[in-house]
């Protein structure tokens, strides 16, 4: 699976982005609110990605922030929520607002999102609560305490959370091995070694 891409922006035609990597143009669907965060055409960008392969097509979805990708993956596992609706949800409210709406059973907030009716909102609350028991607070924490950490440390913590560790466990593991200039892969590998 393609998990991350770095390339030059060739075209922006919301909701699609054309990214050139080694002479190949990748068409990537991204949340509408991510377009304002992208650099100009001709500039380089990095996207976290999720690839869906179907019988008749291959779809690539991109996200500027890794927690958005994690939330997207959780959303598309819910019955009745496809990739397009998941993108609309991510574009309609911030990750923090969405997780708060789930945590506090705010059905009325969710029904304001395009394509989300009352039944879908209720299903989101029920199913997402179970999926996010260990990660909702973790994702909140990453959004609020990220300022004090290097980008690679935040990415490593997010990756460890997606592997099933709590935010507290992941933070401790990364802090034990964090050194200036280390890349994300090194931090993750070294952090996982601390558990052996």
Curated annotation (Swiss-Prot):
Keywords: Cytoplasm, DNA damage, DNA recombination, DNA repair, DNA-binding
Domain III, as annotated region: 154-196
Compartments (UniProt record): Cytoplasm
Region (Domain II): 65-143
Stretches for region Domain I: 1-64
GO molecular function per UniProt: ATP binding; four-way junction DNA binding; four-way junction helicase activity
Protein name: Holliday junction branch migration complex subunit RuvA
NCBIfam families with a match to the protein in the record: ruvA
SMART domains cross-referenced by the UniProt entry: HhH1
CDD domains in UniProt: UBA_RuvA_C (cd14332)
Highest taxon in the source lineage: Bacteria
GO cellular component, as recorded: cytoplasm; Holliday junction helicase complex; Holliday junction resolvase complex
InterPro entries (alphabetical): DNA_helicase_Holl-junc_RuvA_I, Hlx-hairpin-Hlx_DNA-bd_motif, NA-bd_OB-fold, RuvA, RuvA_2-like, RuvA_C, RuvA_C_sf
Chain residue ranges for the region called Flexible linker: 144-154
Subunit structure: Homotetramer. Forms an RuvA(8)-RuvB(12)-Holliday junction (HJ) complex. HJ DNA is sandwiched between 2 RuvA tetramers; dsDNA enters through RuvA and exits via RuvB. An RuvB hexamer assembles on each DNA strand where it exits the tetramer. Each RuvB hexamer is contacted by two RuvA subunits (via domain III) on 2 adjacent RuvB subunits; this complex drives branch migration. In the full resolvosome a probable DNA-RuvA(4)-RuvB(12)-RuvC(2) complex forms which resolves the HJ.
Gene, per the UniProt record: ruvA
Family recorded in the similarity comment: Belongs to the RuvA family.
Pfam families on file: HHH_5, RuvA_C, RuvA_N
Task performed by this protein: The RuvA-RuvB-RuvC complex processes Holliday junction (HJ) DNA during genetic recombination and DNA repair, while the RuvA-RuvB complex plays an important role in the rescue of blocked DNA replication forks via replication fork reversal (RFR). RuvA specifically binds to HJ cruciform DNA, conferring on it an open structure. The RuvB hexamer acts as an ATP-dependent pump, pulling dsDNA into and through the RuvAB complex. HJ branch migration allows RuvC to scan DNA until it finds its consensus sequence, where it cleaves and resolves the cruciform DNA.
UniProt note: domains: Has three domains with a flexible linker between the domains II and III and assumes an 'L' shape. Domain III is highly mobile and contacts RuvB.
Record-level GO BP terms: DNA recombination; DNA repair
């Amino acid at each position: 699976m393609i998990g991350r891409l770095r390339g030059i922006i060739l075209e922006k035609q919301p909701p699609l982005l054309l990214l050139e990597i080694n002479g190949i143009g990748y068409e990537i669907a991204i949340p509408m609110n991510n377009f304002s965060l992208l650099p100009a055409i001709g500039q380089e960008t990095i996207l976290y990605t999720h690839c869906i392969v179907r019988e008749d097509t291959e779809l690539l979805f991109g996200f500027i922030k890794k927690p958005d990708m994690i939330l997207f993956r959780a959303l598309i596992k819910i019955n009745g929520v496809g990739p397009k609706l998941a993108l609309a949800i991510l574009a309609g409210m911030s990750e923090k607002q969405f997780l708060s709406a789930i945590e506090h059973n705010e059905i009325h907030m969710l029904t304001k999102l395009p394509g989300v009716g009352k039944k879908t909102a209720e299903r989101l609350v029920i199913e997402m609560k179970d999926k996010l028991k260990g990660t909702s607070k973790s994702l909140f924490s990453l959004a609020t305490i990220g300022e004090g950490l290097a980008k690679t440390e935040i990415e490593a913590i997010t990756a460890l959370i997606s592997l099933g560790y709590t935010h507290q466990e992941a933070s401790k593991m990364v802090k034990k091995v964090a050194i200036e200039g280390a890349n994300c892969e090194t931090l993750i590998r070294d952090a996982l070694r601390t558990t052996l």
